[in-house]
From Swiss-Prot:
GO molecular function, one term: rRNA binding
Official protein name in the record: Large ribosomal subunit protein uL24c
Subunit-level organization: Part of the 50S ribosomal subunit.
Family to which the UniProt record says this protein belongs: Belongs to the universal ribosomal protein uL24 family.
Organism: Heterosigma akashiwo (strain NIES-293 / 8280G21-1)
UniProtKB keywords: Chloroplast, Plastid, Ribonucleoprotein, Ribosomal protein, RNA-binding, rRNA-binding
Family matches, as Pfam families: ribosomal_L24
Main location: plastid
Purpose of the protein: One of two assembly initiator proteins, it binds directly to the 5'-end of the 23S rRNA, where it nucleates assembly of the 50S subunit.
Amino acid sequence: MKKLTKTNLKYKKQSLKIGDLVEIIAGNDKKKQGTVKAIIKSQEKVIVEGINQRFKHIKPQRSNETGKINQFEAPIHRSNVKKINN
C-alpha cells in the first residue's frame, strides 16, 4: 500500500480571486453569500466580506481611556466556500 504524502495526494483546487462571489457551504454562516476580500495562500484560507464575524475586546491602556470592542471578519478555510458563477 502506498503512503499518502503531499506530493502524491491529488485534489482539485478552486481558483478563487479577490472580488469573487462565494457561498459558504459549512459552519455557522452556511448558505450565506459574500465577496472575497483577501486570500491567505500559506494557510489555504480566505476572508469573505460580512461572513464569520468575530469580536476582540481591548482593555484600556491608560486610566482615562475606555475599553473597545473591535469587530472583524475571521478567515475561513477554502474548502468551506464554493465559487458562484455569474
